[in-house]
């Protein structure tokens, strides 16, 4: 119980500190609406669940110790973040009149496509993030009692991390959607898109070099 209470604030800090997930949730919520943001969060939770299963099977340690596997995941993740960053940097203003009309028409005809894209971005950004592997290999074991059921404890710790992430990003989606009416200035949107792109590329480069 004591170790669990010590783990919760650490997990909360890992979630709250801005990263690639934060930028993706902000971008998709602003561009496609709160529902797309929630699908992004669902993808994020799916990615974390994927690594939970991997950890339970003992494969996270294998991946962390395998230079080839870990490096492959690292570079794939870096390339994916850079791709998303470049795409965001060169994207049109989210709220230009033509873009809004075109987007409204496209979403009305095939909304699932946008939600699927948001979901996949959330999933892949976590599945291809080597730092997620390290959380399961280096941080969580510090709060596991080796005399107890290790898998059960791992599931509890991972569930807490996932729950905190979902709650935090749902709150972020709500705030962004509420503030959207003050963020429709085209100049603001252009600056935001480019800053988002630069930050994502920066995260990608940092991931590749770490």
From Swiss-Prot:
InterPro entries: Homoserine/Threonine_efflux (IPR004778), LeuE-type (IPR001123). The keyword Transmembrane helix applies. The keyword Acyltransferase does not apply. The chain crosses the membrane at residues 5-25, 50-70, 75-95, 155-175. Keywords: Cell membrane, Membrane, Transmembrane, Transmembrane helix. One of its GO terms (cellular component) is plasma membrane. GO terms for molecular function: amino acid transmembrane transporter activity. It is found in: Cell membrane. Disulfide bonds: none annotated. It is a multi-pass membrane protein. GO terms for biological process: amino acid transport. Belongs to the Rht family. NCBIfam families: 2A76. This is Uncharacterized membrane protein YrhP. It comes from Bacillus subtilis (strain 168). The lineage of its organism: Bacteria, Bacillati, Bacillota, Bacilli, Bacillales.
């Amino acid at each position: 119980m004591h170790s669990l209470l010590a783990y919760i604030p650490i997990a909360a800090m890992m979630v709250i500190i801005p990263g690639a997930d934060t930028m993706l949730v902000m971008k998709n919520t602003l561009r496609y609406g709160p529902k797309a943001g929630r699908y992004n969060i669902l993808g994020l939770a799916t990615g974390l669940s994927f690594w939970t299963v991997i950890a339970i099977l003992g494969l996270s340690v294998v991946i962390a110790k395998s230079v080839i596997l870990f490096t492959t995941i690292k570079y794939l993740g870096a390339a994916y973040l850079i791709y998303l960053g470049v795409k965001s940097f060169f994207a049109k203003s989210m709220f230009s009149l033509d873009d809004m009309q075109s987007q409204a028409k496209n979403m009305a005809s095939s909304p699932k496509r946008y939600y699927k894209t948001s979901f996949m971005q959330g999933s892949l950004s976590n599945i291809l993030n080597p730092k997620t592997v390290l959380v399961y290999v280096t941080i969580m074991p510090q709060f596991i009692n080796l005399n107890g059921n290790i898998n059960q404890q791992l599931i509890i710790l991972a569930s807490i991390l996932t729950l905190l992430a979902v709650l935090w990003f749902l709150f972020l989606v709500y705030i962004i959607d509420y503030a959207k009416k003050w963020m429709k200035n085209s100049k603001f949107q252009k600056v935001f898109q480019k800053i988002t792109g630069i930050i994502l590329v920066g995260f990608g480069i940092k991931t590749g070099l770490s």
